[in-house]
Amino acid sequence: MKHRIGRVEGEILRELTKILRKDIRDPRLSDITITAVECTNDLSYATIYYSLLTEDPAKEKEVAEGLDKAKGMMRHLLGQTLTVYKVPELIFKRDTSVAYGSKIDNLINQVKKQDQERENKNK
């Protein structure tokens, strides 16, 4: 059963990415990336994780509103391509791991830069 859920999750991820690029014309959704999909065991709900390249709270709210507005159309289009009896209800959540990873990367780069400056002063 878990293998089937994983396969459906991958299929939803692939199809939603296509739908966002080709069928949804909302400019609020142009900068998002679908990062993961998690389905419940009975496939009645699918949690869709997405990332943004910005940390602007106003932009985050716009994207959330755009996703909520386009949810019905996305579910309808998914129903045309998915090989499941019932299309899962879509729940969108922001994936903050990408932003967190970027923040950690910046901190590491700052520490490296400080170390190099200290080495140059000691020479």
UniProtKB/Swiss-Prot annotation:
Classification lineage: Bacteria, Bacillati, Bacillota, Bacilli, Lactobacillales
Keyword set includes Cytoplasm: yes
Protein's recorded name: Ribosome-binding factor A
Any single GO BP term: maturation of SSU-rRNA
Subcellular location: Cytoplasm
Gene Ontology CC entries for this record: cytosol
PANTHER family named among the record's database cross-references: RIBOSOME-BINDING FACTOR A, CHLOROPLASTIC-RELATED
Role: One of several proteins that assist in the late maturation steps of the functional core of the 30S ribosomal subunit. Associates with free 30S ribosomal subunits (but not with 30S subunits that are part of 70S ribosomes or polysomes). Required for efficient processing of 16S rRNA. May interact with the 5'-terminal helix region of 16S rRNA.
Family: Belongs to the RbfA family.
Keywords associated with the record: Cytoplasm, Ribosome biogenesis
InterPro entries: KH_dom-like_a/b (IPR015946), RbfA (IPR000238), RbfA_dom_sf (IPR023799), Ribosome-bd_factorA_CS (IPR020053)
Subunit: Monomer. Binds 30S ribosomal subunits, but not 50S ribosomal subunits or 70S ribosomes.
Molecular function (Gene Ontology), one example: ribosomal small subunit binding
